[in-house]
Amino acid sequence: MEKSQYDLCVEVLHRLDKAGILKDIVIVGSWCTFFYKDFFAGRKYMTSLTTRDMDLLIPQPRAIKVKVDVAGLLKDLGFVVGFTGTQGYIRLEHPQLIIEFLVPERGRDSSKPYPLSLLGLNAQALRFLEFLSENTIKLEVGSITVRLPHPVNFALHKLLVMGRRPKAEKQVKDKDAAVKILNVLVDSGQGSTIRNAFLTMPKRWQGIVKKQLADITDRKILEILNT
């Protein structure tokens, strides 16, 4: 990853913090695997970042009380407004980063964008995102504090949703990332953390997670889940 991409990410987060909305955001997606290097400091955890996607989850959209023109806030950095999908999901595009906002899907499935009127944006509503926001950690990034899902929730969520990925290579990537994180947690004596997070999942979700782990050679993760 080029240093400039990291610097751009940090500058985006810094501006969102200064505008008063970073506290309402949880960083999700592949950037988590990069930032977890600080959580796993001193452990055998190596990662690289090969994505432009920067996914920002707003767990409680109605909690946002300040009006911020996010597109205008980031315009001088080179971000432009783009649209994706037939429904017109808004994302902020830069040669090095693509920022998309997400919200938890509540109620019936909806393919329509969720309006974030105070931010001048919309968000994609997706299932299972509550699992990422119900157990978070805080890490220092530059001079600011950011929220991310606890690594165990991040990993279990990857296993839960990987089957929904249309491309096989994306499924493999998600599974590899999840197993890698879970193995680091096991090796650092946090097997009970994995077990406790797993038990908060509905039985159907648990079955999906176990199924995705069924073909791995090292059985230690499954043994913890089956304890």
Locate each region found by the language model.
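Compositionally biased terminal segments of proteins
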Residues: 1-227
